UniProtKB/Swiss-Prot annotation:
UniProt subunit comment: Interacts with CCMFN2 and CCMH.
Bilayer-spanning residue ranges: 1-21, 30-50, 79-99, 117-137
Gene name per UniProt: CCMFN1
Similarity-based family: Belongs to the CcmF/CycK/Ccl1/NrfE/CcsA family.
Function: Forms a complex with CCMFC, CCMFN2 and CCMH that performs the assembly of heme with c-type apocytochromes in mitochondria.
GO biological process: cytochrome complex assembly
Protein name: Cytochrome c biogenesis CcmF N-terminal-like mitochondrial protein 1
GO CC annotations on file: mitochondrial inner membrane
Membrane topology according to the record: Multi-pass membrane protein
Subcellular location: Mitochondrion inner membrane
Organism: Arabidopsis thaliana
InterPro entries, sorted: Cyt_c_biogenesis, Cyt_c_biogenesis_plant
Chain segments annotated as coiled-coil in the UniProt record: none
Amino acid sequence: MSISIYEFFHYSLFLGLFVAFTYNKKQPPAFGAALAFWCILLSFLGLLFCHISNNLSNYNVLTANALFFYQISGTWSNHEGSILLWCWILNFYGFFFCYRGRPQSHNVLKQGGYRESLFFFFVLNFVKNSILSLLRYEQESGLKNQLYTPFVLRTLVDSELCSRRNRTFDGPALFYAPLYPERKIKNPLDAWRFRGSREGKRTHPLLHLARDDKERASSIDEQRIDGALGIALFFSFFLLASSDPFVRNFFVCTEPLAELNPVLQDPILAIHPPCIYAGDVASAEGFGLCRSKMMNGIVALHSPPMRKDAAEKNGTLLCSAGCVGSRITSELFTLKFKHVGAKCYPALLLRSNRSPLMLLRRRFFAFSSFWAGARSHSTKRY
């Protein structure tokens, strides 16, 4: 009977790998992450029970004889057990992350509210306030707006208005606003129908910053969660392929063949691997989020609607992503100035742009002094 229980713990690893392969993206991400988490948890508890009960049919238990406390720590004191602990912590973070910050399509409660995540609320609110402060700085300094098109400004204002009134439809209409500002959404019912259309799926990248507090707190989509689940899938496959912790003995033995490593028989070193893994594995979640966010941003910026909009308007996101030098040159050589008349002469043009000229001159002198210093250093050396 005990052999069947240990085999069940062993096969739960294969079940977790099967769930990761056959996960349906139409379902909530927390559903797939929960199944994988519980499967890995059963395997880890099964290996822990093997060490506690001193089951000598397991090879790892046969070579790790020690006291009861170190029998427990012997679960992760070898290569196979440490990889299993790594996979379990990774699936735990994925499950906790999906549960606390589920996407909008799966995060609606029966009361009509949304789950909030304090971390994402703080970060996105900080980014939004930074953008608004940059807007005030550009307005006070009189510089030309490079990032804030009328559509983006209207979106930021609408987000504040939407946060003050209750929604009567499923899902925020602001998030599914199209790239084309000339197409307006008349009522919430049209916005709900517009969600599933092909044009509604191409959203503006800056709309993530323009939603209200509850929407921005729960704005984790499936593609970003799949990046973290893919890392867990790799380690689960590696665990089953080369580091199986449930290897059984082909002979009967009544006493352990070896003791646990004396270096690991220390209270601090016994709890050291779980503490280290808890910090190291958490970085995998951040890596998955950043990777998927960068890929989504690249696809959005190079999409045909975005490139067409960038070619027509000088203040789009693509033009604002340039360096400071491109911004200075665009302000120096453009003919669209408020304080210059219809006949724009070069003298008036340079006079109305003295601050960019000063900045350009400072950078030129800094570069020339750096180049002269490098040449003098090379001549002294040779």
